[in-house]
Every structure is written in structure tokens, then in C-alpha cells.
Curated annotation (Swiss-Prot), chain A:
GO terms for biological process: protein N-linked glycosylation. Subunit of the oligosaccharyl transferase (OST) complex that catalyzes the initial transfer of a defined glycan (Glc(3)Man(9)GlcNAc(2) in eukaryotes) from the lipid carrier dolichol-pyrophosphate to an asparagine residue within an Asn-X-Ser/Thr consensus motif in nascent polypeptide chains, the first step in protein N-glycosylation. N-glycosylation occurs cotranslationally and the complex associates with the Sec61 complex at the channel-forming translocon complex that mediates protein translocation across the endoplasmic reticulum (ER). All subunits are required for a maximal enzyme activity. Keywords: Apoptosis, Endoplasmic reticulum, Membrane, Transmembrane, Transmembrane helix. It is found in: Endoplasmic reticulum membrane. InterPro entries: DAD/Ost2. GO terms for cellular component: oligosaccharyltransferase complex. Residues 53-55 are lumenal. This is Dolichyl-diphosphooligosaccharide--protein glycosyltransferase subunit DAD1. Residues 1-31, 77-94 are cytoplasmic. It comes from the Eukaryota. The chain crosses the membrane at residues 32-52, 56-76, 95-115. The lineage of its organism: Eukaryota, Viridiplantae, Streptophyta, Embryophyta, Tracheophyta. Pathway: Protein modification; protein glycosylation. Belongs to the DAD/OST2 family.
Amino acid sequence: MARSTGKDAQALFHSLRSAYAATPTTLKIIDLYVGFAVFTALIQVVYMAIVGSFPFNSFLSGVLSCVGTAVLAVCLRIQVNKDNKEFKDLPPERAFADFVLCNLVLHLVIMNFLG
Amino acid sequence: MAKLLLYLTLATSLIPLFSVAFSPENPTDRRVLVLVDDFAIKSSHSLYFGSLTSRGFQLEFKLADDPNIGLQRYGQYLYDALVLFCPSVERFGGSIDVASIVDFVDSGHDLIVAADSNASDLIREVATECGVDFDEDPAAMVIDHINYAVSNFDGDHTLIASDDFIKADVILGSKKIEAPVLFQGIGHSLNPANSLVLKVLSASSSAYSANPKSKLSNPPSLTGSAISLVSVVQARNNARILITGSLSMFSNRSGVQKAGSSIKHEKSGNEQFLTEISKWVFHERGHLKAVNVRHHKVGESDEPAIYRINDDLEYSVEIYEWSGTSWEPYVSDDVQVQFYMMSPYVLKTLSTDQKGHYSAEFKVPDVYGVFQFKVEYQRLGYTSLSLSKQIPVRPYRHNEYERFLPAAYPYYGSAFSMMAGFFIFTIVHLYSK
């Protein structure tokens, strides 16, 4: 019984890997970017847990920049993905332009709040 | 002719304004009204009155039931202090009564009341208004069978020799009174809840208050050192009152020998005791004034209208003591200033430069609001100082916070790395196939 679930998990993992290898490179680059943002956010949370939250506004600003970046990148990935029926009529340039503008606003806010 | 008369009356009515009198610049009393039962007191108490006039007081003697006496005329007080040496008066003459005496003290003037073994109800009422309760038994006197004064005839031990003085240099002077003080009269008690009265001379623990001519039928109500022979009251407006139960204490006295001790003093302690305590009552000693309250930020010299939290500021005040003729610097190491808003956030002892200038430096607390600089100084025998100056304190402005903190470098780093990552990502995203 355990052996079959172990084999099932392995089979699941293999199918996920092969399916993921089939995604277009563009989306893989966006996934990498999101992973980088989340990783940076995790580093900051661990730092705050060690040192304490003294300049709390700086902590919030740093974490929010990472989280905001990740969220905007995920939105871009959703809109650019050709397999997505909902955004079939949206030109990818329009999605990219939205992404750039939102990031500009995000970084403006972050710089103001960074202290 | 009418014009001449007019000018004459105008000129004479202006003369009282030029007389040197009681004022905040010169707090010692000058004009003293002495009410007596009969003018023989002038000669039997001549030493005491002589010591007063030699210090510059203008004494005016009147009989207590003289119909022309009055403390004030047209709303202005005619005298700076009142001395009641009339223990047996039933009704004051003129416009004086208990209410006017109480008003006189309430307006800041001083009072000396001396009762005696035949004290009337009126004098007892005046004393009760001042916070002191004489023994209710009208025939009682203070008797002490152990600390009486030795005399040539076999007395009934009502003349007692007492040396139980209060320990206060400001009230009794710095020189120790060697000889005991002779006292013959009624005793009084003080309410222990009253914080304004002080026992200057108390009876010894073997004294009691009873009628010397009759046998004791029940135990006396006033005994021991609860009996006060001489008390002083310093009111909240700094008026000073001296109350004692023996008019003969002020009279000219000779030597004294306490029973049970072999020392025979040539002179009793009465003269020194009464001189020193009169100096205190008439504000020749122990009268403080605080002037020149200033506060400013450390490093600047002008007084700001508002402080910011976590500012360093300095507070200074000058305190002087009246020496009888001039203002001398007051030197003490226990004057404190509070930075107060509902409760003191900062309490600091002021340091002095020995010339009457007190100052302290402290940091404004991390709380904003409207604060007060408060100095509340109440010490035994000194006038109370109550200074208060209001000052608001504001929080940081938006651009006054600390920037570039080393503790926040990781957060700065992550924000900038996110911006760099975004820039690189846009290039890669646009130019990858």
C-alpha cells in the first residue's frame, strides 16, 4: 500500500516535470522572476524575526516591494499565456504596458514609504 | 480761599501713599496695631515692645474696646499686622470682630494672639478660626509638677519652665536657646490632620491642663506633650499667626531655674525665644520669592513657544530670601522642577550656583501634548513657592525622522534589487523569442 502511494507520488512528480518542460520560455522567465521576488521576501521576514521590527515602515516597504512585484508578474503571466481563454483578445503588448505602469507606481510608493 | 482749602486737602490725602509699608518688594510688616486690655501692659511688657520698635516697627496701642479702632478704612488696610494682647475682652470696639480679623489674615497679614488664664470666649473663637483649640474648661491652666520653675514662694506649679522647642532654624534662629522659657497660662491642642499648624513650644510629657484651685474629679482631657504652649500657623497665602496661652510670657522676666536641675539661669529664654519667633512671624526670616523663570533649548538663549519631543532643554529660576532688610540668595539643594501633564513625566532636582540661581537640564519625554513646568516648594517655616508655566510639545515633523538606519539596510537592498530585477526582466521579456 505504501509502496503504491510512493510510486504514485513519483509518477505525479514526473508528469508535472514533463508538463512544465513544455511551457513556453517566456512564461518560464516570468516564473523565475516571481520565484526571485518571493525568495527575497522570505529573506526579509527571517531577518525581521532575528533582529526585531524597529524601522517597521522600512520592513513593510521592503516586503511590499517583493510581494507587489510578484503579484504584478503573476498578473502579466496570466494575461500573456496563450492557453488562457479569458484573455484571448488581449494583445500581449497591452498586458506588458499595464505591467510596466503598475510597477512604476509600486516603486514610487515603495520609495516614499522606505524612510 | 476755597481753592486753597481744596489743594490743602488734596495734598494731605496724598501723604499716606508715601509712607513705607508692607509690599511685595519689602515683605516685612511695618505698621502694627496692638490691642490691649489696659495700658499697664505697655510698661510690664516693655522689653518685648522695645525689641519690636528697635527693629523698626511702628506700634500703635489701643484699648480692645476702644470704639474708634478699625483695621481698614475705605477698603484699604491701615495696618500690616495685628497683635491681640487682650485675653479678657468680651467684645471688640469699633469695626473689629472675629470676621474682620479672619479677613485680615486672609488678605495676607500677620497676627499674634495671646490668651491667658482669664481668656474670654471671643479670644478662644479667634484661636479656633486659626486652627488651634484651647482647653474648654475656663478655669484650667497648664500644671506640671516635674518641670515647674523654682520660685521663692510655694506655688501651685502653674509657672512652668519648658525647653521642648521645635527643631527649625528658620523659625527659632540658628543660635540655640540655652535657658528654658517661662510659661503661665492655658494650653491648647492642635488637630493632627491640620498640616498648616506647628507646635513651636510644647509641654513636657508630665504636664496636664486642669484647674489648680480644685481637686481633680476626673482625668484631665489635655495631657502630656499633646499640650502645645506656643503654636504657629502659616496659611496657604503665607500669612503667619502666632498663638499662645500665656500673656505673661511676653512680660519682663528675670532668671529661671528649672525644678530638678541645678542650673540657675540669669536670664530666662523668653526674650531670645520671643524675639526670634517674632522675626519669623513678621516675615523678617523665611520669606522666599522666586523670580525670573526661564526655559530654553540647550545651546540657544531665547524662549521658544513650542518644544518638540526628545529635545534637550534647560530650565532656570532665581530664588531669594528676605533677610529683614534686603533680598539674599536662597541656598538649598532640594528644589525640584516637574515636567507635568496630569502626572510628572520628569522630576529633576535643580542645581544651584550658590547665588540664588537654580537650573536643570533634561530631555523632553517621548510624549506630545501640553505640559507645565511646575515648581512646588513647601518646607517647614518657609513660604510656599508654587510656580507653573505652560508649554506645548509637538511630535516629529514628516522630515524630522531618522533616515538611513543601518538596521534597515536589508530592506533598502531588497527594494532596490526589486527595481533592478524589474528593469532586467523587462529587457529579457521584450527581447527573448
